Amino acid sequence: MSLFPVIVVFGLSFPPIFFKLLLSLAIFWLVRRMLVPTGIYDFVWHPALFNTALYCCLFYLISRLFV
């Protein structure tokens, strides 16, 4: 459980995990933008699966960081 309260923006309530998801998505975009020019995707068998695993790992790290 998170200690952060539910955040209300313009009458819409958002759970704390929503902001963790958005933060991990922003970091995922940055990491992906850095990995594409390096050519690492040439060695990846399934890029969509790699992207999903990368996002899941980033989300796990962020959620462990803000517990």
Curated annotation (Swiss-Prot):
InterPro entries named among the record's database cross-references: DUF1656
Cellular location(s): Cell membrane
Superkingdom, natural source: Bacteria
Residues passing through the membrane, by range: 3-23, 43-63
Designated name of the protein: Protein AaeX
UniProt key word Transmembrane: yes
CC per GO annotation: plasma membrane
Recorded topology in the membrane: Multi-pass membrane protein
Major location category of this protein: membrane
Gene: aaeX
Sequence similarity: Belongs to the AaeX family.
Keywords tagged on the record: Cell membrane, Membrane, Transmembrane, Transmembrane helix
